Amino acid sequence: MSFVGLHIHSDYSLLDGASQLPALIDRAIELGMPAIALTDHGVMYGAVELLKVCRGKPIKPIIGNEMYVINGDIEINKRHRRFHQVVLAKNNQGYRNLVKLTTISNLKGIQGSGIFARPCINKELLEQYKEGLIVTSACLGGEVPQAILKGDLDHARQVAKWYKNLFGDDYYLEIQDHGSVEDRLVNINLVKIAQELDIKIVATNDSHFISCNDVEAHDALLCIQTGKLITEEKRLRYSGTEYLKSAEEMHLLFRDHLPDDIIETAIANTLEVADKVEAYSILGEPRIPHYPIPPNHTPETYVEDIAWDGLLERLKCRERADITPVYKERLEYELRMLEKMGFCTYFLVVWDYIKYARDHGIPVGPGRGSAAGSLVAYCMKITNIDPVHHGLIFERFLNPERKSMPDVDTDFCIDRRDEMIEYVTQKYGEDKVAQIITFNRMTSKAVLKDVARVLDIPYAESDKMAKMIPVSRGKPAKLKVMISDQTPEPQFKARYDNEPWVKKWIDMAIRIEGTNKTFGVHAAGVVISSEPLDQIVPLQKNNDGAVITQYYMEDVEAMGLLKMDFLGLKNLTTLQRAVELVAETKGIELDLDDLPLQERKALQIRARTGSKKLPDDVKKTHKLLEAGDLEGIFQLESQGMKQIVRDLKPSGIEDISSILALYRPGPLDAGLIPIFINRKHGREEISYQHKLLEPILNETYGVLVYQEQIMKMAQDLADYSLGEADLLRRAMGKKKAEEMQKHRAKFVDGSTKHGVPSRIAENLFDQMVKFAEYCLSFGTEILTVEYGPLPIGKIVSEEINCSVYSVDPEGRVYTQAIAQWHDRGEQEVLEYELEDGSVIRATSDHRFLTTDYQLLAIEEIFARQLDLLTLENIKQTEEALDNHRLPFPLLDAGTIKMVKVIGRRSLGVQRIFDIGLPQDHNFLLANGAIAANCFNKSHSTAYAYVTYQTAYLKANYPVEYMAALLTASSDSQEKVEKYRENCQKMGITVEPPDINRSQRHFTPLGEAILFGLSAVRNLGEGAIEQIITARDNSEEKRFKSLADFCTQVDLRVVNRRAIETLIMAGAFDGVQSNRNQLLHDLELVIAWAQKRAKEKETGQLNIFDSLTAGESIKAKEAANNGFEQEPSAPPVAEFSLQEKLQLEKEHLGFYVSEHPLKSVQRSARLLSPINLVDLDQYKVRQKVSAVAILVAVKKIITKKNGQPMAFLTLEDMSGQSEAVVFPSNYERLQDVLIEGSQQMIWGKVDRRDDQYQLIVEDLEPVEEVKMVMLDLTPQEIANTSTQARLKQILQSHAPQKEQMKIPVVACINEGPTKHFIRFGENYWVNDYGTAVASLQELGFRARLEPLLPQSQSVG
């Protein structure tokens, strides 16, 4: 006999259910269940996932909800008794009613507060939405069982009768047996009531975990939820029988108190319930919202009118007859396609909210992704990119030969994104708009610590174990891997194997690893519906009160709902802020959208006239790009890109677009970048395999760069329609042999008809195929949002709908759904070993992200010994990584480190796979490596527009742009320092914060920039607003003293810590220069100010406080000073310079008073140290010296031979640079590798990943550096005999390889003047004393001299 589980909780019963749906369904099938119901507590989070997981499997999904029912008004939050009630959807109508009830309970029926809050309904709602529902009496928490337990059988009958009357045969009494006395009592009486009222009984097991082996782990989960220890007696605990039971196990229950025939019937009735449930048809066609159309219009005619009017405006034509045929025909074609595919209303919805943004001054991006290929979108000002001019293809956006929803993602200013959500909410109705939920799962590190806490294991112990788990590039290793023979950390496994208590702890954690812990909100997605959402998806409120769906993004889209991505981007905020500052300081109104058009116009004029002149603003922009001054320039900031841009010398947006596609993910080998550059500058001949290719490839100098070029080749050479060409592009991705053969034959046949020799046509087709031929092997695991790590071969072969993690151009991690699944046939696969112990299995040309954000072929990374980007400690469980487009940079999402590829081996020919993505074309593997795939021209052109806008503003309005950039970077001290250094190079001074002048943002002051308060640590928005408001409201519009400040501001908002930070950052220097004194005064001043504030509140004012504002301020001050002196502590000395500098660096990220190396640099000039920022001016392997502070020291153990080495971050007065100490020198130098120390460094210039660094050969604390000083006359210098003797002595004291090298300097006395000559390194010596003694013995005036004068301290 079979059995159907009708009372099942998954991990969507957050921190109560431990069953993940895929494993749960697999186990149910294994147990022979023909169906299964999902009844999570009060929510329907997993309903659509349940349908997806069960699809194609021999099990029927039943959507349900274990709801909470009260007797009373659900909108009045009283201490109502809450009763459990299992509600199942019998059919589509039942699903709709269940959605309605779930939504009402979550939006209006929350009873209780905090962790005790529950979403509730009442019987009136059940009466209203009863149709299509099956209801059971639930567990011991149900109203009927509760009445029985209280001994009130009459009330129990009454309640059961009410449900029977309402639901008829769709009401069942539910018996459970978890071994308690209460279960037996309730079951016996339920059977009696059932017989009396003719109600059927169903047997259930209240399942919260899958296996009986999960009991302890589930108990730990409950303790994590409630914050209790497992050892505590008074806490929530289950019986341990709440697992998924088989039919056989169910038959063994109830026998001690119920007859066999009752048990048999109750189990059989579970099948009856399952049979009643019809297949749901809730996943459906697109539900595009209704857009209000003006009278006498249809959506089609309205779009047509807007588009034509927009095109006339764009092209500056008066009549349609004036429009050139290429635009006219393209627009007519696109409008026909939109009408045919039914997407005109969709375009109106997007047009409307973008129009609202533009009309209200909300910055909007120029376009994103393939939408930039639509002329209709350009005409309607949805995008600002002319697809005709740029050769973009509509079919990359919408293909009539494969109907799918368009996807127009829109970038808005991050500060005003919420306004856009509010607008569409008001436009379409609160009941039709919602944001989207996300779920945060428990990763190995997090679950290990959580379980440790409930087991009362000390934090230090759990932290130590958690730190052993490698989290390289995105995902902590699973605990099962950590205890396996393939463990990346043997010590972790050894403790698991040898310490029983550690084994118990880890085994418990393994059982709940990966379960849902909390929910969050999708950072971009907004759902807009044509009908009330509560008829389609269950809704709830987020913690901030916003309405969100209970289904995550992919499930919402599967329902046919329109999901819009409202992306909040800092970059747009920076641009808008810069434009506003230009208007304020220069009185010039700039139109960002017009800047690329003005460049295009200037280039067209130059091409037409043959003139070499360009307008000054365009010329400045191009010069900035050529110079490689690219800090703060969108997409071009990496070291590698800077060099490429310098070499390329872009002459327009087209060049920028091409280089973005070449450098970032794309189809080309890295070696094609030099070819592209050389062809542009005429150093290499541009050649085409056939003349028909010239118009397609001429803008990229004959180099195949974009997917669109493949489509055009198919169209122009082989007579494909663009729709067919898009299918060809997709087919090349899937690489199915039969399909590819058909396309090959068609392409070659069509090409030969156009006079292309078949040999060339075959070659071209092969080139196009190779365009997408970098792939991963079957077993390579990709990190998916829904299921964790999955083999790419499984994802592709089963076309699993899931999302992956990607990195956007601003370095932020977000999620996006897989759009295409590519089986690329067979090819050689190599296994690349990383120094952290993980491996990557891929074709040699698959691209991965390096530490300076280059995407390079893995083989090149290995060959050049470059570093892969590594992300550690991703905050996935803290409502972060699962969110679409995270509101923080990659650097803040986790800890970046470098990992080398240390080995490789061939795995032979294997089947290979890849995936297609709608936005940024990269994704995280399960071991965290960031892999890449193809790039399209629409995407890179859209990026190129923003790149040009940022370059234009920096070149023409540098102070305003850098002020805006610093403001946008206020939340990152590292970025503030980076851009401040760039300001310094540009001759722009960034002045320190000033309590009387600084605003919230960085502000231009002539040719300088005043530090913004938002970038000072420990100052929240409230404190900043309070300071500025108090200052503006004061009589003198300034603070006269620390005491004046403390009396003017609300000290509850601007707390002591904030004031201390302002003092240490130098913000009070304008009122009192002794920072140490201010810190000593602060406690007294705060107490005094608080006392005055209290007296003011109670009316106990000093008589002089009552003087009117019109009276003499001096008289008032004199009076108050006479009677109530501002307090101060006994005088103290000011901090030393080094102490002040250290505090400035800590609180601002840079030095204000002066750089700590200023005096050191002056003394060290004898040794000719270089500026770190000038490393790229020296030859690779050239020996140099530098004076620098060790900002960061990261010591590692090499995996290859277990030897220690170190990576350093150095800083001098010019900026920062990286350095490395290899094992050969590490042991000798390790004692002086101290963070914060000032060192004299000797080493060689190195270039890795197109970034220059130092290979350290020697270093010494600057205060310990000594020189051998030789006093010589000009005659002695000129004497060849003297030279020979000097050479002989110095070389006799030459240091061996491992010895310290001591500089030798000659002081040339020429009368009253002296000058110094530093001997070359070949003449440096190995020992101070013996070298000086030898020189003195031969009559030379030699002495030992410290680098720094004795009076000079480095603190």
UniProtKB/Swiss-Prot annotation:
The lineage of its organism: Bacteria, Bacillati, Cyanobacteriota, Cyanophyceae, Synechococcales. DNA polymerase III contains a core (composed of alpha, epsilon and theta chains) that associates with a tau subunit. This core dimerizes to form the PolIII' complex. PolIII' associates with the gamma complex (composed of gamma, delta, delta', psi and chi chains) and with the beta chain to form the complete DNA polymerase III complex. It is found in: Cytoplasm. It is an enzyme of class 2 (transferase). GO terms for cellular component: cytoplasm. This is DNA polymerase III subunit alpha. GO terms for molecular function: 3'-5' exonuclease activity; DNA-directed DNA polymerase activity; nucleic acid binding. The gene is dnaE-N. DNA polymerase III is a complex, multichain enzyme responsible for most of the replicative synthesis in bacteria. This DNA polymerase also exhibits 3' to 5' exonuclease activity. The alpha chain is the DNA polymerase. SUPFAM superfamilies: Hedgehog/intein (Hint) domain, PHP domain-like. GO terms for biological process: DNA replication; intein-mediated protein splicing. It catalyses: DNA(n) + a 2'-deoxyribonucleoside 5'-triphosphate = DNA(n+1) + diphosphate. CDD domains: DnaE_OBF, Hint, PHP_PolIIIA_DnaE3.
